[in-house]
């Protein structure tokens, strides 16, 4: 007891003495003051030139004020990227396919643990370069409105609601839960109407309708700001209604800050401020572009155009107070990250470097890959028998690390390719591998002549009991503004949704051998595999599944896991005439507005078991807009093996004049059920939130009184239960 009192006394004396010491020093050095006060004090002590230097992503040290050098640019889309070894989780589109927000939070927590641990180690070594910081430019919550967009793989799909829920979970996992200090900063990008074409992103001007803007392009950003409390928002390259998205007062001030109450900081996409005068030709000089961006609400410039701000102030293009306001936002963020406080005050400073690539994170990467895999077709071929004797694994993405990773990835310590996964899962089988075909015409996949590679693959298939064809895409073909020009691909985007011809031809030849074929697809976007759907007995969609992707695919093939991923995008048929890629109108796009029959609908995914739905109940069949409606139902595993089901709730307006969408996702639950097990699932509907539409006449959101339908299903096209209710007039 005496020792405990003595320790308490010493701690109290330390706090009192520290408080006295802090009161005698500069305000910005006092951790007892709030971060905004400290940031404002620090900014007030800088010269104009020093202020300007801190508003570019490469911010130099200011030794006289104790400010260390810092580079704001860091990437963490599905793992810490470009900073050495780090756990690589499935690409973002694959994480979205899990329909599992709790898992997403765990993944983001693991990413941020590794990021903070790396930062701690970099600090000990005095390192302050790019990819060594705490401000991460993820997640990408743009809407994957068109399957041709190469960066769609970075998103959470085509649906605003799913994107919002997965994005919130990611942000909260990244930023941590300490009441004072952030673990790191997440950044919602690219605000707000941005989804290709990649080759035109520095030049094109988007003119979305107000309905599309407020019902499709803005909701996820609003959710991440207001519910997720995201610390940063990144502007896009393109123009929106004539103004650069990175210098757009309506987006950055009126909507983001005034309407939504955003109190974080904004950052331009890299060299987007330069685009203002070099490519958009909005103003003629760097000084005018920099001044326009700052005055429009852009705090941080990724690039160096803000170097012109000093001259811009001297020329009267903006006031130094405009600089002060923006920089105070930025320095507040650095204080909140603990960059100016003793490490013992910042709980995240104790994260050890050993968390990187830890066994726990590796296991989580495997689980995430397991949950992301989508079973698209199964005519009873899967799961494969463990007693199979001879397996032919064929295809250009079977024994390659690239299709595991997608873009914006780190360096995994021990990645498992799909071929390696199959060999490990079938140790007693003879597993023969053949590359078989080039990824696409123009990319050579080995030393063999294409005809020789094809013949080798066919020989392997004819001698096998089962053929596993692994093909699709890699991030060498689809991604961000790439120097790519191959059949079906241009500039990072796709010009053809079909499987590359070299692969399609080999797949058809393999099927013609008469041996059972499983098609495993690696991709970050929809593939129009119409022929395979008609002829191949089993199709498994792996996405870009991360470092343990090969293990996860093999587990699904052999039934060690039961695939339960669901499509976060629509897969269109090969002959579907899509709207022009550069047309941002939502009419005819995504499951919400598409009137045709898709190859695979949004939310689709098969299982090795069967699920039965029953007993849908609403606690009221009439409600005012401000009320809440509780929805309950039961789901039962009616099959013979355990599995996950993703229960999906859609709402459909039944009345005119605003029967505007086919249906909209407004809830989902991933539940695990043993054979014969039944579980109750519940949702809450808030008409004011879940049924609102944007009223052009009122320039505001509204809820129409009238009839609506609750639809419970296993996908957007597989509705099992329905019940109607009425929203009464206010």
Predicted regions and their residues:
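Bacterial N-terminal signal peptides that target proteins for export
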Residues: 1-10
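Glycoside hydrolase catalytic-domain context in secreted enzymes
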Residues: 2, 22-693, 702-716
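Bacterial N-terminal signal peptides
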Residues: 10-19
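Extracellular/periplasmic metallocenter environments
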Residues: 699
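Short beta-strand elements
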Residues: 718-730
């Amino acid at each position: 007891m005496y020792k405990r009192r003595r320790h308490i006394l010493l701690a109290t004396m330390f706090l009192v003495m520290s408080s006295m010491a802090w009161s005698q020093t500069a305000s910005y050095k006092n951790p007892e003051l709030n971060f905004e006060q400290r940031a404002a004090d620090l900014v007030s002590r800088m010269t104009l030139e020093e202020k300007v230097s801190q508003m570019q992503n490469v911010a130099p040290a200011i030794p006289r004020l104790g400010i260390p050098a810092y580079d704001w640019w860091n990437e963490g889309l599905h793992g810490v990227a470009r900073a050495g070894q780090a756990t690589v989780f499935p690409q973002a589109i694959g994480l979205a396919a899990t329909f599992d927000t709790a898992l997403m939070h765990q993944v983001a927590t693991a990413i941020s643990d590794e990021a903070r641990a790396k930062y701690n180690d970099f600090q000990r070594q005095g390192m302050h370069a790019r990819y060594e910081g705490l401000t991460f430019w993820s997640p990408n919550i743009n809407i994957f409105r068109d399957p041709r967009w190469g960066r769609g793989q970075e998103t959470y799909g085509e649906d605003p609601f799913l994107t919002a829920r997965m994005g919130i979970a990611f942000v909260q996992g990244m930023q941590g839960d300490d009441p004072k200090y952030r673990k790191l900063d997440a950044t919602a990008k690219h605000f707000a109407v941005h989804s290709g074409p990649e080759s035109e992103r520095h030049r094109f001007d988007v003119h979305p309708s107000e309905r599309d803007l407020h019902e499709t392009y803005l909701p996820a950003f609003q959710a991440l700001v207001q519910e997720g409390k995201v610390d940063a928002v990144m502007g896009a390259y393109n123009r929106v209604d004539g103004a650069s998205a990175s210098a757009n007062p309506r987006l950055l001030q009126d909507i983001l800050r005034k309407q939504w109450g955003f109190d974080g900081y904004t950052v331009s996409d890299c060299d987007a401020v330069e685009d203002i005068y070099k490519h958009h030709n909005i103003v003629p000089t760097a000084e005018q572009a920099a001044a326009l961006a700052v005055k429009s609400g852009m705090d941080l410039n990724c690039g160096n155009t803000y170097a012109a701000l000093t001259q811009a102030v001297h020329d009267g293009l903006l006031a130094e107070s405009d600089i002060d306001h923006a920089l105070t936002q930025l320095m507040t963020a650095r204080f909140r990250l603990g960059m100016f406080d003793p490490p013992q005050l910042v709980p995240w400073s104790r994260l050890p470097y050993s968390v990187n690539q830890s066994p726990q994170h590796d296991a989580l990467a495997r689980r995430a890959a397991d949950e992301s895999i989508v079973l698209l077709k199964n005519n009873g071929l899967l799961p494969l028998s463990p007693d199979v004797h001879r397996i032919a694994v064929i295809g250009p993405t079977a024994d390659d690390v690239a299709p595991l990773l997608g873009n914006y990835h780190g360096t995994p310590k021990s990645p498992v390719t799909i071929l390696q996964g199959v060999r490990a899962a079938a140790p007693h089988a003879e597993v023969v591998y053949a590359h078989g075909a080039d990824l696409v015409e123009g990319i050579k996949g080995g030393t063999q002549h294409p005809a020789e590679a094809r013949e080798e693959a066919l020989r392997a298939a004819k001698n096998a009991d089962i053929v596993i064809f692994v093909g699709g895409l890699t991030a060498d073909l689809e991604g961000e503004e790439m120097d790519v020009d191959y059949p079906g691909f241009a500039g990072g985007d796709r010009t053809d949704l079909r499987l590359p011809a070299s692969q399609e031809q080999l797949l058809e030849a393999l099927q013609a051998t008469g041996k059972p074929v499983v098609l495993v697809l690696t991709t970050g976007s929809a593939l129009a595999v119409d022929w395979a759907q008609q002829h191949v007995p089993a199709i498994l969609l792996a996405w870009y599944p991360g470092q343990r992707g090969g293990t996860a695919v093999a587990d699904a093939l052999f039934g060690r896991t039961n695939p339960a991923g669901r499509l976060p995008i629509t897969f269109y048929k090969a002959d579907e005439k899509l709207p022009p890629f550069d047309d941002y109108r939502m009419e005819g796009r995504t499951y919400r507005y598409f009137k045709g029959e898709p190859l695979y609908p949004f939310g689709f995914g098969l299982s090795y078991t069967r699920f039965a739905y029953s007993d849908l109940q609403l606690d009221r069949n009439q409600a005012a807009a401000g009320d809440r409606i509780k929805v309950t139902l039961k789901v039962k595993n009616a099959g013979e093996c355990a599995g996950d089901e993703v229960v999906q709730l859609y709402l459909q307006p039944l009345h005119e004049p605003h029967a505007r969408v086919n249906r909209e996702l407004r809830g989902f639950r991933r539940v695990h059920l043993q054979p014969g097990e039944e579980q109750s699932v519940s949702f809450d509907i808030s008409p004011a939130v879940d049924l609102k539409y944007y009223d052009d006449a009122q320039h505001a959101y509204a809820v129409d009184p009238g009839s609506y339908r609750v639809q419970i299903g296993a996908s957007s096209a597989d509705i099992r239960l329905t019940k109607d209710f009425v929203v009464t007039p206010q």
